[in-house]
């Protein structure tokens, strides 16, 4: 029987609430997803928050220069605190922690393990050094190296080398000690999934919202977790999990 991957609600999902809001994370619990993803950054007053972008708006100040209260005011909603979201989902969903910055790995994972247990989370990040910090400090916690960095974050001269290292990431994975890969859907259509499973790594594919692509990845034998903004739809398309993946 074909195994079916788990579903991760990206930013809590956005089918019934704004993404990365408290309401989205409450809704994720009822969505049928097994995982829920949240991005982690730190504000200027040291609060670890669930927020994707490095700035408050396209031309706004960096998060590192505003307090949590200022961030909420500028964003126009109560930006969730990481500890609160972890407490909300504890025992209900696996936390998919996407680390957006370096330097706070131990603090975040200490809290996560205390609230969720080591088997209640998976850590993803684009930064090899963050993966290495987590795998060294918390070998019992699953980590996945994210592949598919936004080209807008890269100088033109770095783009070819970065893409090559994502298409053939074995050296990076060995160096940082990742247990898996979190692959952008475009890269997932290359050889990356095949190589990952050949090496015994678990795999996540992000962020898949189109019905036809979801169907394709939900029946893909090399996909362990599908990350989507539409967790209810993904669960409906998938049907029940037929065999535990990891």
Predicted regions, residues:
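Phosphate-group recognition and catalysis centered on beta-loop-alpha active-site segments
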Residues: 1-246
